[in-house]
C-alpha cells in the first residue's frame, strides 16, 4: 500500500462511528449490524470503493461462509476476511435464511477487521459462538489425559504451517477442532489458522 492510501484508511478507522443501533429483545443487549457499519463508513469513503463478497467454503463436512471486504482507490487495496459456520438446524429458519444470517455475521466481522472495530466482547459474538459450538455437556470437559487447549492449538498451527496436502490438513483440523470442544477461543483461532492456510495453498496451486 502507498503511504497516501494507508493514511486514508487510517483516517477512516479514526473517524468511523458505528453505534450499536440494534437491540435483541430476547437476550436484552444492543449490538451493531453489518448495515450499521456500512451506514457509518460510506460518508468517509470519499472516492474509495468498498466491496464485500461471500464464498461458501467446505471444511471437513461442514459449510462455512467466508466474507471478504476490500477497500481500494483503483491502484492500492486492502482486504480483510472472516468466516462463520452455518448451523445444521436453526429453529424457525429455512436453509436460505440460515445462509443469509451466517453471511451477515461473517460480513460484519470482516468489516470489523478492515476498519479496526473491536466487537470481541459483544453479546451477539458470544451468542453465535454458543450456537456454533453447542455440544453435549459430557463433551465440554477435558479428561485428565487430554492435552491443554493451548497445546492443541499450538501444535495445529505448527502443523498447518508446513502441511501442503489439503486432505491431510482437513483431517488434522477436524481432529484437533473436536479436541477443542468447550474452549471457544481456541476453537475460533483454530478455524482462523485453517482458513489462512487454505488461502495460502490456493494461491500457490
From Swiss-Prot:
Pfam families associated with the record: ERF
Compositional bias annotation for Polar residues: 131-145
UniProt keyword annotations, A-Z: DNA-binding, Early protein
Coiled coil stretches, renumbered: none
InterPro entries assigned: ERF_bacteria_virus
Chain residue ranges for the region called Disordered: 124-150
Similarity section: To phage H-19B erf.
Protein name: Essential recombination function protein
Naturally occurring in which organism (per UniProt): Salmonella phage P22
Organism ancestry: Viruses, Duplodnaviria, Heunggongvirae, Uroviricota, Caudoviricetes
Amino acid at each position: 500500500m502507498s503511504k497516501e492510501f494507508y493514511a486514508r484508511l487510517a483516517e477512516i478507522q479514526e473517524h468511523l462511528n458505528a453505534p450499536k443501533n440494534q437491540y435483541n429483545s430476547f437476550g436484552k443487549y444492543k449490538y451493531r449490524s453489518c448495515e450499521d457499519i456500512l451506514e457509518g463508513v460510506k460518508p468517509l469513503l470519499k472516492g474509495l470503493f468498498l466491496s464485500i463478497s461471500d464464498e461458501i467454503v467446505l471444511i471437513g463436512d461442514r459449510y462455512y461462509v467466508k466474507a471478504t471486504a476490500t477497500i481500494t482507490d483503483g491502484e492500492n487495496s486492502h482486504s480483510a476476511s472472516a468466516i462463520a459456520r452455518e448451523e445444521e438446524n436453526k429453529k424457525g429458519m429455512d436453509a436460505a435464511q440460515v445462509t443469509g444470517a451466517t453471511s451477515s455475521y461473517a460480513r460484519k466481522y470482516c468489516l470489523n477487521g478492515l476498519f479496526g472495530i473491536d466487537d470481541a466482547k459483544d453479546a451477539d459474538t458470544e451468542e453465535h459462538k454458543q450456537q456454533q459450538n453447542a455440544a453435549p455437556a459430557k463433551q465440554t470437559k477435558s479428561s485428565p489425559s487430554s492435552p491443554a487447549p493451548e497445546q492443541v492449538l499450538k501444535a495445529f498451527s505448527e502443523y498447518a504451517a508446513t502441511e501442503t496436502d489439503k486432505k491431510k490438513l482437513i483431517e488434522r483440523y477436524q481432529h484437533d477442532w473436536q479436541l477443542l470442544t468447550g474452549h471457544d477461543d481456541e476453537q475460533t483461532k483454530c478455524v482462523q489458522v485453517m482458513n489462512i492456510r487454505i488461502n495460502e495453498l490456493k494461491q500457490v496451486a
